[in-house]
Amino acid sequence: MLSLVLLGLVCLSCSTEKDYNLSPRANFDALWHELDVGYCYFQEKLPADSTWEMMHQKYLPRISEGMSSYELFDVLSALMMELKDGHVTLYSSFDTKAYDEWRASYPSNVDRQVRFRYLGSAYRIARSLVYAPIEYNEHQKDSVGLIYYSSFSNVVGHNNINAVLQSFQNCRGVIIDIRDNGGGSLSNAFTLASHFAEKETLVGYTSYKTGPGHCEFSSPKSTILKPTKYGILWKKPVVVLTNRGVYSAANDFALFMKQLPQVTLLGDTTGGGGGLPRGSELPNGWRLRYSGSKTMDPEGNQVEFGIPPDIKVSLKESDIEKGKDTLIEEAIKVIVEKSKSTP
């Protein structure tokens, strides 16, 4: 499972004064070796005709003892980018590098200005949740609730969620917009999702790296989503809006919600990010983060490359020009249709 916050919970191998070493070759070898023994997606990420050892041979000729720190950083970054993993990140005092093509190479399917038009000027903010009802039937005053959650790095508590859902008690359903939510704390994903689970639900499995071999993993451990014990349990229809910008803990939230019967994922396949980040420190003090576990859905499928929506919908330019959000409009239709059969 994914969370930037959990990075602080894993064991970091830190450089001591005795270990401190500015040698480009020493740092190149340290980064390559750390990933070699700890990274979890070699089989999924590298082409069939390539190996991690071949990557070492490919980039070693670019290492020289007279190179600058900037040049070394660029070579190490290029080596890491071969893994095409958004969680693989290198941090120095002068730069940070992470792979971002999981999002950048795809349509965004979101227009922020149009999204806030639906929230209107009277929206409220419950800590990290921006919310407002949307009236879609002017004569009958029917409405659905819209929740926008920008980042799971922003804390959300049960009291906040209860306040939002209480305000939507007369709505036919709820839309949760997590488009471009790049993740954050996994605990926030569990907290929010727990208010929509009527019973304990298997939402996936996690396998942890247990040894230096590329295939050494623990047996899959079940991940169970439990209903909240702290307030409102929402049973009406829910639509979660997704795009390629949904990553890491937000990807997990999409995975959790997809397993619930009253929930529909609508939009585009998420960006993925199914590995729990681990961290270490290079001899020169630069920090390295990478995926150290694998997350699977209840059927055993990897979620590293994203979670497909139940209903694929793309944002139309013609709708944007009219001030409309194609995904929100379709989500309203789904909720209206589902609410007809909801007690």
Model regions: which residues?
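Sec-dependent bacterial lipoprotein signal peptides
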Residues: M1-L12
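Structural motif
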Residues: L6, H139, Q166, Y230-L233
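Short acidic (Asp/Glu) and glycine-rich catalytic loops that position anionic groups and cofactors
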Residues: V10-L12, R172, P309-I311
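Flexible, low-complexity junctional segments that flank or bridge functional domains
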Residues: C14-Y208, H214-S222, P237, G279, ...
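Short, contiguous clusters of charged residues that form electrostatic/catalytic patches at enzyme active sites
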Residues: N159-N162, T326-E330
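Conserved acidic, small-residue-rich alpha-beta core segments centered on
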Residues: S187-K322, E329
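C-terminal alpha-helix
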Residues: E330-K338
